[in-house]
UniProtKB/Swiss-Prot annotation:
One of its GO terms (molecular function) is toxin activity. Antimicrobial and mast cell degranulating peptide that interacts with lipid bilayers and activates G-protein coupled receptors. Shows antimicrobial activity against some Gram-positive bacteria (S.aureus MIC=5 uM), Gram-negative bacteria (E.coli (MIC=50 uM), S.enterica), and fungi (B.cinerea (MIC=8 uM), C.albicans (MIC=25 uM), C.albicans, C.glabrata, and C.neoformans). Does not show antimicrobial activity against Gram-positive S.mutans. Changing residue 6 to K: Loss of antimicrobial and mast cell degranulating activities. Mastoparan-17; loss of antimicrobial and mast cell degranulating activity. The potent mast cell activator mastoparan-7 (abbreviated Mas7 or M7, which contains Ala at position 12 (K12A) and an Ile at position 13 (L13I)) can be used as a mucosal adjuvant to produce an anti-cocaine vaccine to induce an immune response that could attenuate the effects of cocaine consumption in humans. In mice, this preparation induces the production of high-quality neutralizing antibodies, reduces cocaine penetration of the blood-brain barrier and protects mice from its psychoactive effects. This is Mastoparan-L. The modification Leucine amide is found at residue 14. It comes from the Eukaryota. Keywords: Amidation, Antibiotic, Antimicrobial, Cytolysis, Fungicide, G-protein coupled receptor impairing toxin, Immunity, Innate immunity, Mast cell degranulation, Membrane, Secreted, Target cell membrane, Target membrane, Toxin. GO terms for biological process: defense response to bacterium; defense response to fungus; innate immune response; killing of cells of another organism. One of its GO terms (cellular component) is extracellular region. It is found in: Secreted; Target cell membrane. It holds the Pfam family Mastoparan. Belongs to the MCD family. Mastoparan subfamily. It comes from Vespula lewisii (Korean yellow-jacket wasp).
């Protein structure tokens, strides 16, 4: 998992 994917997941969760 890369930073872009992590950022996208965080945006979905938050």
């Amino acid at each position: 998992i890369n930073l872009k994917a992590l950022a996208a997941l965080a945006k979905k969760i938050l």
